[in-house]
Amino acid sequence: MRHPLVMGNWKLNGSRHMVNELVANLRKELTGVAGCDVAIAPPEMYIDLAKRAAAGSHIMLGAQNVDLNLSGAFTGETSAEMLKDIGAQYIIIGHSERRTYHKESDELIAKKFAVLKEQGLTPVLCIGETEAENEAGKTEEVCARQIDTVLKTQGAAAFEGAVIAYEPVWAIGTGKSATPAQAQAVHKFIRDHIAKADAKIAEQVIIQYGGSVNASNAAELFAQPDIDGALVGGASLKADAFAVIVKAAEAAKQA
């Protein structure tokens, strides 16, 4: 039985005051929640502050990106060792905004995946198609290609304990969302694709949905058998909205 994971990606948002206030409110809103893992990924400079604010709670820490180098002359970068040292566990890689704005390739993202696994951290591998790819019927082709870059270099075993976040690019920050049936079909395809290499690992890998998840559509999404939680953007900046999503995941997977 897969344990759901709901993770908040704060993106480029935050201040010391906001971090303390949001985490304090999350702690209140999530009191008693045990059936869903919860993680937040603040901007890097606030990870330690968020960790202290979340101390003693079930809220886990993550980060929004990582460099593939562990140390050296790489100005402006943050290594997996540093993230591990500061207490981040769930590390987002391959987010569509990184792929688009920073031209990150599938090959680079696969290398980041390997570095995180070597450091004992949990990669949250974002995959998904653009609107043009979706309209051209290439959703499965794109998702398979993005997964295969890891499978072919590291094998199916690399996905043990890892997380995949399916984020249809056309649904991120647009208010659009795939229907629960559409999302389920892609999630099932992803799981079946990994199962070709290793059925046992495919069955246990967490596959989140990451396309404009909010309080109103969360319950219906999580009722789908292959949707194991969510990677949440805008709604993760509001404690009450984020808590509704977490509780919906908990309720759906206990049903």
Swiss-Prot record:
Pathway linked to the protein: Carbohydrate biosynthesis; gluconeogenesis; Carbohydrate degradation; glycolysis; D-glyceraldehyde 3-phosphate from glycerone phosphate: step 1/1
GO molecular function: triose-phosphate isomerase activity
InterPro entries found in the cross-reference section: Aldolase_TIM, TIM_sf, TrioseP_Isoase_bac/euk, Triosephosphate_isomerase, Triosephosphate_isomerase_AS
GO annotation, cellular component aspect: cytosol
Active-site residues from the entry: 95, 167
Keywords: Cytoplasm, Gluconeogenesis, Glycolysis, Isomerase
Gene Ontology biological process: gluconeogenesis; glyceraldehyde-3-phosphate biosynthetic process; glycerol catabolic process; glycolytic process
SUPFAM superfamilies to which the protein is assigned, alphabetical: Triosephosphate isomerase (TIM)
Protein residues bound to substrate: 9-11, 173, 212, 233-234
UniProt main location, coarse: cytoplasm
Sequence similarity: Belongs to the triosephosphate isomerase family.
Function of the molecule: Involved in the gluconeogenesis. Catalyzes stereospecifically the conversion of dihydroxyacetone phosphate (DHAP) to D-glyceraldehyde-3-phosphate (G3P).
Protein name, entry field: Triosephosphate isomerase
Organism: Salmonella typhi
Originating gene: tpiA
